[in-house]
Amino acid sequence: MLVQYGCYNARQSLCKIGTVTLMVELGIKFLLSYFIGSIMGSMVMGKLCGGVDIRTMGSGNPGGTNALRTQGGLFALGVVVIDVGKGLIAAGIIPGIELPIVGTDLEISRTWLTLNCAAASVIGHVWPMWHKFHGGKGASTLVGTLIILTPGLIACLLLVWLWVLVLSGYVGLATMIASLSAPVYLAVMRLPSDQPLFIYCAMFALYIVFTHRSNIRRMMDGAELRNSRLMFFRRRN
C-alpha cells in the first residue's frame, strides 16, 4: 500500500510539473509573439524616414493603406513587409524555439501552440503595448500567419481581395470579404480534418470585420475613400 501510494503521489507530482511546464511555454511564447506583433511597421518606417507618424495623417490608421495614401508606394511597401513579417515570425519561428530552463513540452499540440502564437501577433498588431494600444487593423499580420498555416489559401484570398477591390474600389471592404472567405473555403474544402485552422480563421474573420467597423460606418455614410483608379467598372465622364 505504501509503495502504491508513493507511486500515485509521484505520478500526481509529474502531472502537475507537466501542466506547469505546458502553461509556462504557452504563456512565454504567447507573450513573445504579442511583443513582436506590437512592433508597428509604420512606426519603424516613420523613424527611418525622419520621424514621420502617419497616425496624424489621412485616416489616422497606422496600416499599409493609410501609408500608401499619405507617404507613397515605397513607404507603404516597407510597412506591409514588416507587418506581414511579424505574422511569419510568430507562426513560423516562435513555436519551435526551445526555451531555456523550460524547454519544449512534447505534450503540447504543436498545431494549437502555433495558432496561439499566430493569434498573439495579430492581437499585438491591433493593440500594441509599445504604442499605447493604438494599432492597425490586423489584416497584414493575419496574412503573414496564414502564409505559414495554410499557404495554399493565400492565392484564393488574394483573388477575392482583388476582385472586390476592382469592383468596388474599397480596400477595407475587399479586406473584410477576403477574410470572411477564408473560413468559408476551409468549411467546404478542409473540414473536419482542419478544425483548429477553421476556428482560427473564423474567429479572425470576425475580428477583422470588427477592426474595420469605422470603415463600415463611413461606407454607409458615403464618406469612405474609394480608389477609383483600381475600379474596373467606374463611371466615365
Describe each model-derived feature in a short phrase.
Residues 44-74, 135, 217-237:
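Cytosolic, membrane-interface loops and tails of multi-pass inner-membrane proteins
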Residues 17-29, 92-116, 147-154, 187-199:
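Helix-coil boundary and interhelical linker segments in multi-pass alpha-helical membrane proteins
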Residues 52-64, 130-143, 170-178:
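Short, non-helical or kinked segments that cap or interrupt transmembrane helices
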Residues 42-45, 123-134, 161-168, 213-215:
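C-terminal ends of transmembrane helices
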Residues 29, 33, 38, 42, ...:
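Alpha-helical transmembrane segments in multi-pass membrane proteins
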Residues 155, 171-178, 193-204:
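Loop-to-transmembrane alpha-helix initiation sites
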Residues 68-72, 94-98, 120, 138-168, ...:
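Interfacial segments of multi-pass membrane proteins
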